[in-house]
Regions:
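Membrane-interfacial terminal anchoring regions of lipid-handling membrane enzymes
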Residues: 1-252
Length: 252
């Protein structure tokens, strides 16, 4: 079965630390000694040139009153319906890449056998200390599979240089391709070259009025700076050296 170790969608684009309770509840099936099958976790990395509900997610900031689940559901439906109508009327162009990568299965039994202790004989607090380490192992594998799409790559530059010439942007994206590859990332459509990636990303961002562009210069719309940051943040963990560390005391 599929699960989101983070416990939900990211509101700022960052890869979030895992929720220990979710995995702990699954792993506790091993407390039943008659259950002898291995538990295999297949890490999956997904990223997009466009997340349909990005404006809804970005709007859910900590310094604003929280939207109720019903309110968020209605807003999300409204955005999805609006996009569907645009597709129907052929008013919106291709949304770009939606890319998924699957990693090698992670065997819980193999990991557990290397612990030197049966974690299911421990009390809840100590067991969850071990489960937290397994969570981090899984999420680190997920993080290494998150693709770097053209829009994310361009936004990674624009978040630092909100006003930039197209030539400078293309040069920065070219360097970004090499940097992310060196960090072990999968760069989507890198074979097309930086110029092609920039052209496509700016087209999609421009259609949404996230950026303003003339023949020489690109400028981020200040009202949508957080949208640019959202896509840049989705690949920021490569530079930070991995996912945020689980704060174990919060989960015991």
């Amino acid at each position: 079965q599929a699960m989101f170790p983070e416990g939900g969608l990211s509101r700022d684009g960052y890869l979030r630390p895992p929720k220990i309770g979710l995995l702990d509840s699954m792993l506790c099936s091993k407390e039943d000694r008659s259950f002898t099958r291995d538990l295999l976790f297949v890490p999956v990395g997904i990223n997009y040139d466009r997340v349909l509900e990005d404006r809804v997610l970005v709007g859910e900031s900590d310094d604003k009153p929280k939207t109720t689940k019903a309110g968020m559901f209605k807003r999300t439906l409204s955005i999805i319906f609006g996009n569907a109508m645009k597709f129907w009327n052929r008013q919106i162009r291709k949304n770009g890449h939606a890319t998924v990568h699957f990693g090698d299965p992670i065997s819980f039994d193999e990991w557990h056998g290397q612990r030197g202790v049966d974690i299911f004989t421990l009390d809840k607090k100590n067991r969850r200390q071990h489960v937290a380490e397994f969570c981090e192992k899984v999420m680190n594998e997920v993080g290494l599979l998150i693709p770097v799409t053209p829009v994310c790559l361009v936004c990674d530059v624009l978040v630092r240089e909100p006003v930039i010439t197209i030539d400078a942007l293309t040069s920065a994206v070219e360097k970004g391709i090499e940097e992310f590859r060196g960090l072990g990332a999968i760069v989507v459509a890198e074979e097309k070259g930086a110029e092609w990636m920039v052209e496509g990303a700016l087209l999609r961002l421009g259609l949404r009025h996230v950026i303003k562009q003339n023949e020489q210069t690109v400028r981020v719309n200040p009202d949508d700076a957080r949208i640019v940051a959202y896509y840049a943040n989705s690949v920021a963990h490569y530079r930070k050296g991995g996912i945020p560390t689980v704060e174990k005391p919060n989960y015991v």
